[in-house]
Swiss-Prot record:
Keyword flag Magnesium: yes
Listed name of the protein: Inosine triphosphate pyrophosphatase
Species in which this protein is naturally found: Oryza sativa subsp. indica
Record keywords: Cytoplasm, Hydrolase, Magnesium, Manganese, Metal-binding, Nucleotide metabolism, Nucleotide-binding
Pfam family, one: Ham1p_like
Catalytic activity, EC: 3.6.1.66
Regions that span the bilayer: none
Length: 202
């Protein structure tokens, strides 16, 4: 597709999030490579397979903003629990806290887990979303480090003796599930060569 003409987007991509820490990470990873704005939308909480959830949220968001959107879904999957909590990690964390996440694995020797991040890009209403998936393997440990960003204190990636929360941001962003998924998003944008139209009205 290298000879294909660049597709014009009506406006900059809207990254849908109300999470300041998540937005900070995405900005740090993407830099100026992709022009985007952020917006908090109240999208219904869905159930199902992670990629299906992410795609449906992208469809709904694209309809709401009437333009290109990028949505993110994050999973934390415990291998001993056959992938749970998975996409429902947010609610598990809210209800049980970091100690509760560890307690889920008390009866199991296997503390291994993987973090997964799915970005879905819909170029506009009615457009089929594209997905970009990043995974990082690790294990669940008692909480260490700052407790200001989700489950970062209890996830220690393989090959490191620090949890996500203990790592310098620059290191985490290179090896994290979010960093890997966003690297694929950046590759797609570079290859697709999208052009954002500027009609001067905003």
């Amino acid at each position: 597709m290298s000879g294909a003409a660049a597709r014009a987007l009506p406006k900059a991509v809207t990254f849908v999030t109300g999470n300041a820490k998540k937005l900070e990470e995405v900005r740090a990873i993407l830099g100026s490579s992709i022009p985007f704005q952020s917006l908090k939308l109240d999208l219904p909480e869905l159930q199902g397979e992670p990629e299906d959830i992410s795609k449906e949220k992208a469809r709904m968001a694209a309809s709401q903003v009437n333009g290109p959107v990028l949505v993110e879904d994050t999973c934390l999957c415990f291998n001993a629990l056959k992938g749970l909590p998975g996409p429902y990690i947010k609610w598990f964390l809210e209800k049980t806290g970091h100690e509760g996440l560890n307690n889920l694995l008390l009866a199991y020797e296997d503390k291994s887990a993987f973090a997964m991040c799915i970005f879905s890009l819909a170029l506009g209403p009615g457009e089929e979303p594209m997905t970009f998936v990043g995974k990082t393997a690790g294990k669940i440990v008692p909480a260490r480090g700052p407790a200001d960003f989700g489950w970062d204190p209890v996830f220690q990636p393989d090959g490191f003796d620090q949890t996500y929360a203990e790592m310098p941001k620059s290191v985490k962003n290179q090896i994290s599930h979010r960093g890997k998924a966003l690297a694929l998003v950046k590759e797609h944008f570079a290859a697709a060569n999208y052009k954002v139209q500027n009609d001067g009205s905003a």
